[in-house]
Amino acid sequence: VFAADAPVLIQNATILTVTKGEVKGSILLQNGKIAQIGEKVLAPQGATVIDGSGKYVMPGIIDCHSHIMAEAINEGSVSVSSMVGIEDVLNPEDIAIYRALAGGVTTANILHGSANSIGGKTIVMKMRWGRNADDMKFEGAMPGIKFALGENPKRAGASAGRGGAPGTGGRYPATRMGVEDVIREAFNNAKIYQANWADYNAKKAKGEIAIPPARDLQMEPLVEVLEGKRLVHAHCYRQDEILMLLHVADDYGFHIQTLQHVLEGYKVAQEIAQRGTGASTFSDWFAYKMEANDAIPYNAAILTKKGVVTSINSDDAELMRHLDKEAAKAMHYGGLTPTEALSLVTINPAKQLKIDNRVGSLEVGKDADVLLYDGDPLSNFSKVLKVWIDGHEYFDRDQEIDGRPKKEADKKALITKAAAAQRATGGGRGGAAATTGDPNK
């Protein structure tokens, strides 16, 4: 996609491939891909050679649930907002991108919010800091859509100012029963829309005169879900609503790709695993609202051991900066191995987003989304030193620290210049002098 950088060879490092064990040796990044991994790798001409003695290399971290780059994430005026898309309102200058890079995040699933039973379209992005939003899109990644169950869509329907209590007014639904009904009714309509287009296409193929159905931007993404062309990421907490959504999907013949948060997933892990649905959860958040009261820090480990592809996500710009340490908690709470813990933020979210052929592990031919640490990534004392995406270096800890004095000096100079300009124009906005009193006198 972008001009190729010079090859990068990291030597004498501990390489955590995640899927193929641990290698003591070298890794070569070339032409945006992982070119070689082995005990000894020769440096090609023009390569940047890095001594990785005492250091660790691992795949870039993937966050399956993020809202960075977006400000207004909920189109909460309707219960089904599948016609809107988060990809059209992303801010590539959000400083949270750079901070996520500093914590090793290279890819994120940017989601619509959880105010709607069926929310807006989602998109997978690479943290290519300094690029425009289009250039940050993960090329070829499947599109998604956000669903939400429980308190959030209920609250949006019957909050203060919108009726005040369930059943007294405001936007439907106001109960968990209503949330299920909204989803079922939407897919009833989607199946009708799908059938109308199928009938039109069949007549057209036979050479018959046919009038195409009116295009419906709300229904199109749901038809894509029915046809397996769009992934469903569903916000949920309680075991009853988790089972409800799985049963709805069974009835209408579509797949729930990931259950997001899924704090009571440990109670119904077998049912989740049977359907091949993934779980993207917090490490140890609990009791921050009523439906989170039964959350336990063993959730990720239990789900993993029951055969559910499980990831740890952030849902928060600050938490996103230390997802590696969040994953490490599953070693204490549940006894996961170091490789299983790393998988929670690498290969597992890659599988959930269906991008594991490109990222999520260190394998020859995969994208060169690579992290260099000064120690074991699962240690609280280890720090990210460098981050590469597609073989291009997007973060260097030493350069960041060394450059801070100049940044502060530049910032101070700009503030001084702006203040002087404001004084010269009288301090008013737009260059006009400030006035007092009634301007009509």
Cite the ranges covered by each PLM segment.
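Active-site gating loops and adjacent loop-to-helix segments of metal-dependent hydrolytic enzymes
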Residues: 74-90, 131, 148, 153-160, ...
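His/Asp/Glu-enriched, well-ordered alpha-helical/loop segment
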Residues: 72-75, 79-84, 231, 270-273, ...
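Extracellular/periplasmic ectodomains of large secreted or surface enzymes and adhesion receptors
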Residues: 5, 305, 386-441
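Histidine-rich, glycine-flanked metal-binding segment
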Residues: 15, 19-58
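Polyanionic/metal-chelating signatures
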Residues: 101-256, 260, 383, 389, ...
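C-terminal cap of metal-dependent C-N hydrolases
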Residues: 13, 363-407
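Metal-associated gating/positioning segment near the N- to mid-region
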Residues: 52-123, 131
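Divalent metal-coordination and catalytic microenvironments
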Residues: 13, 32, 54, 65, ...
